[in-house]
């Protein structure tokens, strides 16, 4: 679908990468999955970029190769789980294994306004699955959401369209997940023109 607006999903080995793509396609926007080492020129046409979760720690030696120049692109970027931690580390924040990982349902408190929170209720249920946590804010970012356990669960840059979530909006246990992804698609200004019927044609 070369003439359609599309979002790029960078796959860090997450079982959820294809689910992320599926959720975005259900919103009517075509999605392509790429390796995180991809050259930036392959992403220039994307309306937005999503960094998936992954099973590795950002400190592991065998992490998937990542092209850091991707984070210098002008499109909106959304990091999820591993992608959230990777973005925080890249921009000078701290990530650590605090021994207080979160696995399962959690309640998200909204701390600051964000385009991601449009039509999303405060204290909404989200799905967490992480051992490492962001423990210190990266430069230029603010916390827009936290869990009751105190996890820095949602960040956004104060000047650039950079967002990151520790939780998984693509799974149904995150009750407002579809709305959050829809809000990201909206701020990417991606026109919903994709459908399975058109793809088959």
Each PLM stretch: what is its role?
Residues 4-9, 14-80, 84-85, 91, ...:
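Flexible gly/pro-rich beta->alpha loop and the following alpha-helix that scaffold active-site loops
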Residues 64-80, 85-179:
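Pocket-forming structural segment of enzyme catalytic cores
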């Amino acid at each position: 679908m070369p003439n359609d607006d599309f979002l790029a999903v960078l796959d860090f080995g997450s079982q959820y990468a294809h689910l992320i793509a599926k959720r975005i396609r259900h919103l009517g926007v075509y999605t392509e999955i790429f390796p995180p080492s991809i050259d930036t020129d392959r992403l220039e046409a994307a309306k937005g970029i999503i960094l998936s979760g992954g099973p590795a720690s950002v400190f592991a030696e065998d992490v998937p190769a990542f092209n850091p120049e991707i984070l210098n692109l002008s499109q909106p970027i959304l990091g999820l789980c591993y992608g959230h931690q990777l973005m925080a580390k890249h921009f000078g924040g701290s990530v650590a294994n605090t021994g207080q990982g979160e696995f399962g349902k959690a309640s998200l408190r909204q701390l600051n306004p964000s385009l991601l929170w449009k039509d999303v209720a405060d204290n909404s249920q989200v799905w967490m699955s992480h051992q490492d946590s962001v423990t210190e804010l990266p430069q230029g970012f603010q916390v827009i959401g936290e869990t009751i356990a105190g996890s820095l669960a949602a960040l956004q840059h104060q000047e650039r369209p950079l967002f990151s979530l520790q939780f998984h909006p693509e799974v149904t246990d995150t009750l407002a997940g579809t709305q959050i992804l829809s809000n990201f698609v909206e701020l990417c200004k991606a026109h919903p023109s994709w459908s399975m019927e058109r793809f088959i044609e």
